[in-house]
Regions:
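Short, solvent-exposed mixed-charge patches
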Residues: 177-178
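Beta-sandwich interaction modules
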Residues: 139-150
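Sec-dependent N-terminal signal peptides
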Residues: 4-14
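Hydrophobic beta-strand residues in large extracellular and virion-surface proteins
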Residues: 36, 49, 96, 107, ...
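Short, exposed beta-strand-loop hairpins at the edges of beta-sheets
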Residues: 149-174
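N-terminal signal peptide c-region/cleavage motif recognized by signal peptidases
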Residues: 16-18
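N-terminal export/targeting and maturation segments
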Residues: 21-83
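Mature extracytoplasmic domains of secretory-pathway proteins
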Residues: 60-140
């Protein structure tokens, strides 16, 4: 099954049953890396990476996702529901490196299994931890910041991957359709 067909199916079941998932909601040790936005409302799925005091990935599964409920207010959040994990959850993640000033994680989204995301973490010159997601967009590596899901009445019309070029000079976009 193609990633877009899988995403279509998974988004179609979003209106079914509701139970809470075990996703972590943002805290002081989580840092945002990219989002998924949908055409139906302003809410977004925020992907974050949990970091230790050295800005290195914390634990064996440091990447998680939660809802930013922007329709309810700028600071409202909610965990992903178990029925939403297939559409927005991670198929896998592995910590590739932990160092004294950062690290690296490879994560694979269930909806985009052929587009692994590499998250590099580091401490900036201001002393703050940072996470930067890199994925292939339009055939080249780019710093992923958003996946936009354009819905139609019977599922997903297209996905739009958006990221900054590696040199930061322009936005790179790729539209994925069936």
């Amino acid at each position: 099954m193609s990633p877009l067909v899988a995403a279509t199916f998974l988004l179609a079941v979003l209106g079914s049953y509701s139970t809470a998932a075990s996703a972590d909601v943002a805290s002081s040790s989580t840092f945002p890396v990219f989002t998924i936005a949908k055409s139906e409302n302003k809410n977004q799925v925020q992907y974050v990476v949990r970091l230790d005091d050295h800005c290195a990935p914390l634990g064996p599964s440091p990447v998680s996702a939660y809802w930013r409920m922007l329709e309810q207010g700028p600071r409202q959040t909610a965990p992903l529901l178990s029925r939403e994990v297939e559409a927005y959850g991670l198929a896998s993640q592995v910590v590739l490196a932990r160092q004294s000033r950062g690290g690296e994680v490879r994560a694979v989204l269930r909806a985009l299994p052929l587009r692994p995301v590499t998250i590099e973490t580091s401490r900036g010159s201001d002393g703050a931890c940072r996470g930067l997601a890199t994925a292939s967009i339009a055939g080249a590596p780019a710093h992923l910041f958003n996946v936009y899901v354009h819905l139609k009445w019977d599922g997903v019309d297209y996905l739009l991957l958006q990221g900054w070029s590696m040199d930061g000079s322009h936005v790179v976009r790729e539209r994925l359709t069936r």
